[in-house]
């Protein structure tokens, strides 16, 4: 799904204040950076919602420890009719997490943090809006 966060990103990475939003306008308003989530490998899990007179049992894709996470692709698209996305040069392995990205002041790069699932290192990459190529800016 484009620009709508999976449960694990909503709950654990972006936070509830994101309201599942997984897209970000460039400072010059010419492009939109977004995350595309593939939840198909994430197991379903029942979650009870107490709202309403009788409540509701909802089925949601919820990755428990050791189970698959969603795979994520990072796209950048121009804000014009017919534009095609440029995909950031990351693999779509579910064994990694991406943090909330931010734009460079000149709107030429989208900065993205990435860490492996075991969260042993944090890398900050700059991604070119022109071709999706990336380069490492910082490792922590």
Predicted features and spans:
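A short local loop/turn or secondary-structure capping micro-motif enriched for an aromatic residue
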Residues: 2-3, 41-43, 94-96, 119-121
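Conserved beta-strand and immediately adjacent loop positions that scaffold enzyme active sites
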Residues: 73, 100, 123-125
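Loop/turn position at the start of each blade in beta-propeller repeats
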Residues: 18, 69, 93-98, 119
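Predominantly five- to eight-bladed beta-propeller fold
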Residues: 1-24, 31-87
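Long hydrophobic segments that form regular secondary structure
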Residues: 79-80, 84-116, 129-131
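Short, surface-exposed linear patches
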Residues: 16, 54-57, 98, 110, ...
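Beta-strand C-termini and the immediately following turn/loop, strongest in propeller blades
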Residues: 21-24, 33-39, 64-68, 102-105, ...
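Beta-propeller fold detector
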Residues: 1-2, 86-89, 134-140
